[in-house]
């Protein structure tokens, strides 16, 4: 199914024309929803600290999670205490839940498990972003909130909107769902504060981001094996665009005996992956690794990657955060 969807969205498959009437309906529904917030018929909840929303206008992976991790580290370096909120996609969460390093990806979601495993940041997940933000502020001394994937969740007040675009696939056929991959029209890019292009050329007023491989690490934290870079590996990826990961491995000099793409947010079975690897080293993404660490074999590995953005982006982002923080502090003191 995903193969057909990709052909419709990114390769000009003629089935898109049959889906266009549904895209028109989707556009109407989303326009009405935005109007309800704009007219004040639905309320947006402001928060006492700067809120950065990291999202996209397309369905599927674009590099949001590495961007969130980059922002966490950038803000910490400048003396801020950031916290993160997320939906926890794929997990059955009742109300809100604080994410800990001991939580499984199944219980909190792939991305939250990865973010907390990598950074140890205070993080709360739940279906309603406003509730997660309030819980985060109530339980942790955070002074900036990063919302992982909440661009279309308009009930959450936000001060900075950052959109991440897949530099290889762009906006596809530029149609709204279901004929195309867009959650909102391309016009939305003109309204956000920052547009980050992952792995492709940036246009004027956009920022280029590269994902730089940093280390090959064992999926099983107790493993004592040493990775042999001369041995062919079986590559797997359950992300929005698996081909991007396989290309990265090839560019880094890995020999791929086999590559297999799974659906995004795929739940994995130990026996299936053991059969796939067939005693060869199994190489996966960091997001896949958090779902496999409890049953990982000695020769299962993941490639950690770090987002790289320009000093100009850092300067502009930090300037905006400081400005918003000062304004909110002044308002809280009646200035």
From Swiss-Prot:
Transfers the gamma-phosphate of ATP to the 4'-position of a tetraacyldisaccharide 1-phosphate intermediate (termed DS-1-P) to form tetraacyldisaccharide 1,4'-bis-phosphate (lipid IVA). It comes from the Bacteria. Its EC number is 2.7.1.130. This is Tetraacyldisaccharide 4'-kinase. It is an enzyme of class 2 (transferase). The keyword Lipid metabolism applies. Pfam families: LpxK. It catalyses: a lipid A disaccharide + ATP = a lipid IVA + ADP + H(+). Belongs to the LpxK family. The keyword Lipid biosynthesis applies. One of its GO terms (molecular function) is tetraacyldisaccharide 4'-kinase activity. One of its GO terms (cellular component) is plasma membrane. It comes from Shewanella sp. (strain MR-7). GO terms for biological process: lipid A biosynthetic process; lipopolysaccharide core region biosynthetic process. Pathway: Glycolipid biosynthesis; lipid IV(A) biosynthesis; lipid IV(A) from (3R)-3-hydroxytetradecanoyl-[acyl-carrier-protein] and UDP-N-acetyl-alpha-D-glucosamine: step 6/6. Keywords: ATP-binding, Kinase, Lipid A biosynthesis, Lipid biosynthesis, Lipid metabolism, Nucleotide-binding, Transferase. SUPFAM superfamilies: P-loop containing nucleoside triphosphate hydrolases. ATP binds at residues 58-65.
